[in-house]
């Protein structure tokens, strides 16, 4: 516990918060070939690998993921949400932040319904999260 005098002399240091999605906090200047501090909510990238991985201990499944090379030249692993997808190597995708709790090292999500990624088929509820259009009413 510091004394009042020590606090007057030094003061308290603010804690630096580390980003949950560091690849979104970097930009890239392709003319100068240098990284910049330009953060953005989403980034575009190209799939370099699409596959499945198994989750951590109590869970069991085959979770779909894609390895994505972003427009700022950083390569990240992103989760593909929803049932079924049309992604393959060289597909152009949009990624957002947000980790997957039971997949170690996966800190990003692919946005469904944007760029080359199709929305989830036959989805009725929570459509906006999966890029699904409103179904036509049957009369």
From Swiss-Prot:
A Pfam family per the record: Ribosom_S12_S23
Region (Disordered): 1-55
Molecular function per GO: rRNA binding; structural constituent of ribosome; tRNA binding
GO cellular component, one term: small ribosomal subunit
Swiss-Prot/TrEMBL keywords: Ribonucleoprotein, Ribosomal protein, RNA-binding, rRNA-binding, tRNA-binding
GO BP annotation list: translation
Polar residues: compositionally biased ranges: 32-42
PROSITE patterns cross-referenced by the UniProt entry: RIBOSOMAL_S12
CDD domains: Ribosomal_S12 (cd03368)
NCBIfam families xrefs: rpsL_bact (TIGR00981)
Complex formation: Part of the 30S ribosomal subunit. Contacts proteins S8 and S17. May interact with IF1 in the 30S initiation complex.
PANTHER family membership: 30S RIBOSOMAL PROTEIN S12 FAMILY MEMBER
Similarity annotation: Belongs to the universal ribosomal protein uS12 family.
Function noted in UniProt: With S4 and S5 plays an important role in translational accuracy. Interacts with and stabilizes bases of the 16S rRNA that are involved in tRNA selection in the A site and with the mRNA backbone. Located at the interface of the 30S and 50S subunits, it traverses the body of the 30S subunit contacting proteins on the other side and probably holding the rRNA structure together. The combined cluster of proteins S8, S12 and S17 appears to hold together the shoulder and platform of the 30S subunit.
HAMAP family: Ribosomal_uS12_B
Protein name: Small ribosomal subunit protein uS12
Organism listed in the record: Halalkalibacterium halodurans (strain ATCC BAA-125 / DSM 18197 / FERM 7344 / JCM 9153 / C-125)
Taxonomy of the source species: Bacteria, Bacillati, Bacillota, Bacilli, Bacillales
């Amino acid at each position: 516990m510091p004394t009042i005098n020590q606090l007057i002399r030094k003061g308290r240091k603010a804690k630096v918060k580390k980003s949950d999605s560091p690849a979104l906090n970097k930009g890239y200047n392709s003319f100068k070939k240098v990284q910049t501090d330009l953060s953005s909510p989403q980034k575009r990238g190209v799939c370099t690998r699409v596959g499945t991985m198994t989750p951590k201990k109590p869970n069991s499944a085959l979770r779909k993921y894609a390895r994505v090379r972003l427009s700022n030249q950083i390569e990240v692993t992103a989760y593909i949400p929803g049932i079924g997808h049309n992604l393959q190597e060289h597909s152009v995708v949009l990624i957002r932040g947000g980790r997957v709790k039971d997949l170690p090292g996966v800190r990003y999500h692919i946005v469904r319904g944007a760029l080359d990624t199709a929305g989830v088929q036959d989805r009725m509820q929570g459509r906006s999260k999966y890029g699904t259009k409103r179904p036509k009413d049957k009369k």
